[in-house]
Amino acid sequence: MVRFCSATLGLLLLAAAAQAQDDKLDTKMALSGERLFRTYCGACHGKAAKGDGPLAKDLKVAPADLTRLSEKNNGAFPFQMVTETIDHGRNVRGHGSQDMPAWGDAFKSTSQTPDEPKRMMRELAHYLWSLQPK
């Protein structure tokens, strides 16, 4: 029982530490996220993340302007919603018969470590956070 409680407490502390890291913008993560954004997101969302990428015109629904996420969330950056959308995709019908890609699956299939996909999604979210008007 003591081992179980110790293990559970350890996991809770790790989760709390990871959550605390996302309470404020991390510029180092944002810089890494910019590279990922250009690789995975820019074709649809555009270089400036305004939804005007070169593939946007081919979609039924225009990609979101990702520079307005905080504005649409009462001034707070919706970090968890962003990482969940990156991970699981989004039910948007702009991709014809497909929804927005679930990048979490793509990241998992190419990752060297189990933690890498989550880190990549967090880096992307920090980058998008850095694009929000102050």
Feature-to-residue mapping (PLM):
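Extracytoplasmic electron-transfer domains, predominantly the class I c-type cytochrome c fold
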Residues: D58-L124, L128
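Bacterial N-terminal signal peptides
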Residues: S6-A16
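The canonical Cys-X-X-Cys-His
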Residues: G33, F37-K47, M100, L124, ...
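Electrostatic cytochrome c docking/interface patches
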Residues: A18-L36, K72-N74
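Detector for the c-type heme attachment site
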Residues: C44-G51, D105, W129, P133
